[in-house]
Amino acid sequence: MSNQKVYIVLPAYNEGKVIKEVIKDIKAQGYNNVIVIDDGSTDDTYEESISAGAITIKHTINRGKGAATQTGLDATRQLGADVTVTMDSDGQHNPKDIEKLIKPIIENNADVVLGSRMLGEKGMPSSRKLMNKIGNFVTYIFFGIWVSDSQSGFRAYSKKALDSVYTYMDRYEFESEMLGQVKSAKLKIKEVPIKVIYTEYSLNKYKHDAAFTAQGLLNGIKMVIRLIENTLIK
């Protein structure tokens, strides 16, 4: 699409069964700069990522998705990325959508682009829907910004955006914290619809729907508590 240097960041925890294929699919779309952050995995995620040709950074302990993503963003800053894309490492995000996310940035129409599952095709597990609704509400209450999919991990950032924001929260609440910083920095944000790939592997995570709905609610409550704690500390 352009001469822009694009890096793909994959925070990963125990994704050894699928990470190599995920990296392969990303590279098949022409994006060869892939960084995997192995967040203290106990399986072969690290080895599989290296064998697939990804730049691989390992956390010695599991620090959380937020910490892993921030490590990846730090790395792309140092490597001089023009555009950085974050994706989930379990194969749910379609690499064909990367172009859709980076295009507004390359054309100077946005600083941050969110891939929204709510604007795309339906079929999201109910636990994820609940977590997303809670996340949207919490993001608006704490940071005054409303988007359709505040908890989406499929995002693209311009160099300007990465130079303007930095998250401190280690787990899933960092998604909301990042949006708050985007607003504070007065960066241009855009949402685009994405197609989520629900494979047998990914759906296995939600096979007991009631249990995962309860877990989604619990995670939402934990997120609120951590955001309150972070606000009080500041």
What are these regions (language model features)?
Residues D38-Y46, G91:
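A conserved acidic beta->alpha catalytic loop
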Residues K5-Y7, E177:
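Cell-envelope/extracellular polymer assembly enzymes that use nucleotide-activated donors
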Residues I61-R63, A67-Q78, P95-Y172, T199-V224:
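Acceptor/aglycone-binding surface of glycosyltransferases and processive sugar-polymer synthases
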